[in-house]
């Protein structure tokens, strides 16, 4: 029921196979009847022959290395890779790092809504993280790669309540100070930050600013910059799917050459979808 079990299963399976580890593949070339694979280990290069090759090197989010160059050297098309399932760069919640809350988030690119999700938000000094942000990050990265110039993230920390309901709930709260009243919906540290972002003074009285408090629970922040690759779980981009047979994952132009998993231009949301794609494409 945890990731360690998955790793242990892989290790056990690999123990039944002849696997050479700590060897870096430096070249992949066609040869008569199959393929030639050059690998470097301990300063020495060894060449292997194979009738079939399965390219399962993941992406640079996995290793930090651009292993796709082995395939592009053979003339196989690819799309640029950008970080996905990663925190959205944004400093709006600096000072509330580590606070979590449930919200609905809508991502806008150049003023137009492009994606919406609900889930947990994790505040960080330099980013908005958590399940909600991670799932929006794929759309964010793709649109940034395509040239979108500005982004907004509209958060709603009371997504199941209308404005009148929020105001009535706040009005009924025994808490008098405005910023403290937001604990009815969010943790106090986040409520303090939201109130400050909305321009509500620290000494404000709740009953004098119910509309402002309602608006504070529905802030708009501005992510900027590409998510960090080292924080990404996967990337958007990879080897062009049009170059591979969807029934077998074999290259349409090179017999005996296969690609699976994250090496291909496929990515999914959080929740194990990317792992499942790796296993399912490998099973083909």
Where in the sequence are the language-model features?
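Flavin (FAD/FMN) cofactor-binding core of flavoprotein oxidoreductases
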Residues: 1, 80-93, 98, 221, ...
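A glycine-rich dinucleotide-binding beta-alpha-beta segment and adjacent secondary-structure elements
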Residues: 192-267
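Short beta-strand to alpha-helix junction loop
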Residues: 1-12, 60-65, 90-93, 202-209
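A conserved FAD-binding loop/helix module that cradles the flavin
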Residues: 56-70, 74, 265-284
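An anion/pyrophosphate-binding glycine-rich loop and adjacent beta-alpha core
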Residues: 76-82, 87-207
